[in-house]
Amino acid sequence: MRSDSIKKGLERTPHRALLFATGIPKSEMNKPFIGVATSFTDIIPGHISMKELERFIEKGIHTGGGYPFFFGIPGICDGIAMGHKGMKYSLPSRELIADIIECIVEAHQFDGIVLLTNCDKITPGMLMAAARLDIPAIVLTAGPMLAGYYKGQRRNLTSDTFEAIGKFKKGVLTEKDLEALELCACPGAGSCQGMYTANTMACVTEALGMSLPGTAATPAVMSEKRRLAFETGVKIVELVRKKINARQILTKEAFYNAIAVDMALGGSTNTVLHIKAIANEAGINLPLEVFDEISRKTPHLVNIIPSGEHYMEDLYKAGGIPAVLKRLKDKIYSNPTVSGIDIKEIAQKAEIYDENVIRSIKKAYHKEGGVAILKGNLAPDGAVVKQTAVSSKMLKFEGIARCFDSEENAMKAILDGKIKEGDVIIIRYEGPSGGPGMREMLSPTSAITGMGLNESVALITDGRFSGGTRGPCIGHVSPEAARGGPIAIVKDGDKILIDIPKRKIEILISESEIKKRLKNWKPPKQKIEKGYLLRYARNVSSADKGAILE
């Protein structure tokens, strides 16, 4: 066992002394040492239930014949970090999480690891660590939040708080409504209720084979989640004994399966960044084109908020990810999972309990999957759009550029009523390096939707979008503005063409004019002059490469 390097032999006398100082009984010293990376915090709703899950994981590890050691991992709530300086730290925290887990696991030579996670950048950071370390590993996502209720209707974070700001400015909602929605939109523990980034990544994790069947959609408050936590603890010891390492599960086929499930769910565009980053750690190259190829062949079968009317709890009741896999059984590859059951067998045995929530391929919401990859002279290296959240009338759109060099300036213009029908909002210098941190533009997109402009105004950015975004919102524009991408030289009044079916994004000026503007462009001064973000800005790759550190 790996842990023998810290507990066996004469030279390890001081190591054993320190281990005994923790209270470990001598009888447990020959058991596999299991690290449990817990991201519990009481500021993220999706993580407040983890203390109880920790206890069930612990019981499971003991039952399986291992000995657990818990250690803490930081987490950021993207919703609370949204719309201000804090969002600059969200994506960079993904790399920190992976690095911290690597440091702790290697320093203490754990035999296997349980990764307790739930929200946006924490889950991919943990999966990156698992792929990098290539030891036995299993993920437990803590589960989605239930719907809130107000005036007899189901409520959720995005449409009933973020979009409510625009509705209030337009006079659709009263101040009393806003105050009430603040108190009831998010009723308790769990990741936010829709197919936003946290829940999409939980579904991707299960489709990768890195969590037990049923884990992703089971709500945080269900007793079933505790049983899954217990089984996760039992299973990690089995994985250690069978010497099944993470990369035996994280194969190219696993990533193709995960992308297919993501496309069928109409998931968050952030998964493009995260799946690429995880694959990179596993030594697998996933070009952007792979996402588009799989999307073109995978129908959109599940329509959960923000693009649809269903909630994560509906997906749970309908059969969860195993049921989605059943729909896709002819489109996925055979591959092992942490459960010990092949993903194809999980799909075969699954039951579908609601045909309206998980549609058949013949009755798909859309013939293609959730994400489309666009290219053109505005984004030579690619851009990403959630095409299933765009109305049919906006799939092809030509508009006039309105340029802003920060999210804040764009947000002010939107709320001040300065954005009109036919405008294409350009938000730049918000990329991985230029931001730095590639902030999510949920506040501007929600304001656009709340003010009723989501079918007449488009938004293009080198930043990102929350999984809660809907409408013609194109992000991850590469190269980014700060590194001389063409988005940097767009001017107010330029005509912009978006053609999602043809995968085009163009600035309608001559090639000679583009070259002239690029020649005259000068990079702006770095916004950050110290700390982690400065190091991140200097070393982060472009979005088309997953915004990984190089």
From Swiss-Prot:
UniProt xrefs under Gene3D superfamilies: IlvD/EDD C-terminal domain-like
Residues that coordinate or bind [2Fe-2S] cluster: 119, 192
Binding site for Mg(2+): 78, 120-121, 440
Protein origin, superkingdom: Bacteria
Active site: 466
Details of cofactor binding: Binds 1 [2Fe-2S] cluster per subunit. This cluster acts as a Lewis acid cofactor.
Catalytic activity: (2R)-2,3-dihydroxy-3-methylbutanoate = 3-methyl-2-oxobutanoate + H2O; (2R,3R)-2,3-dihydroxy-3-methylpentanoate = (S)-3-methyl-2-oxopentanoate + H2O
Pathway involvement of the protein, from the record: Amino-acid biosynthesis; L-isoleucine biosynthesis; L-isoleucine from 2-oxobutanoate: step 3/4; Amino-acid biosynthesis; L-valine biosynthesis; L-valine from pyruvate: step 3/4
GO biological process, one term: isoleucine biosynthetic process
EC number: 4.2.1.9
Entries under SUPFAM superfamilies matching the protein: IlvD/EDD N-terminal domain-like, LeuD/IlvD-like
Cofactor: [2Fe-2S] cluster; Mg(2+)
GO molecular function: 2 iron, 2 sulfur cluster binding; dihydroxy-acid dehydratase activity; hydro-lyase activity; magnesium ion binding
Keyword Membrane: no
InterPro entries, per the entry: Dihydro-acid_dehy_C, DihydroxyA_deHydtase, DiOHA_6PGluconate_deHydtase_CS, ILV_EDD_C, ILV_EDD_N, IlvD/EDD_N
Residue positions where N6-carboxylysine is found in the record: 121
NCBIfam families, A to Z: ilvD (TIGR00110), PRK00911.1 (NF002068)
Binding partners and assembly: Homodimer.
HAMAP family: IlvD (MF_00012)
Family as reported in the entry's similarity comment: Belongs to the IlvD/Edd family.
Name under which the protein is recorded: Dihydroxy-acid dehydratase
Organism, scientific name: Thermodesulfovibrio yellowstonii (strain ATCC 51303 / DSM 11347 / YP87)
Species classification: Bacteria, Pseudomonadati, Nitrospirota, Thermodesulfovibrionia, Thermodesulfovibrionales
